[in-house]
UniProtKB/Swiss-Prot annotation:
The presence of a 'disulfide through disulfide knot' structurally defines this protein as a knottin. The cysteine framework is VI/VII (C-C-CC-C-C). It comes from the Eukaryota. Residues 1-22 form the signal peptide. The lineage of its organism: Eukaryota, Metazoa, Spiralia, Lophotrochozoa, Mollusca. Expressed by the venom duct. Disulfide bonds join 49-59, 56-64, 58-69. GO terms for molecular function: ion channel inhibitor activity; toxin activity. It comes from Conus leopardus (Leopard cone). This is Conotoxin Leo-O2. Residues 23-47 form a propeptide.
Length: 73
């Protein structure tokens, strides 16, 4: 009887832990490098620049597309 109660409480506790942490992990990516690449991509897309075709002052390797900096390919 005691073992059954302990098992039920353990299962309920583990289920509650999973439900609590599930809300926080929905929008996160698993790998830090992927988050960094996405952050740099978003950072470059939101930086304003001067004239079209000129290097962006914010980031090395980015060029002005007319109004925003983008990675030069």
């Amino acid at each position: 009887m005691k073992l059954t109660c302990v098992l039920i409480i353990a299962v309920l506790f583990l289920t509650a832990c999973q439900l609590v942490t599930a809300d926080y992990s929905g929008d996160e990516q698993q790998y830090r490098a992927m988050r960094l690449i996405d952050a740099m991509r978003n950072f470059g897309d939101t930086r304003s620049c001067g004239r079209r075709g000129k290097p962006c002052p914010c980031c090395r390797g980015f060029r002005c597309t007319g109004s925003f900096c983008r990675k030069w390919q």
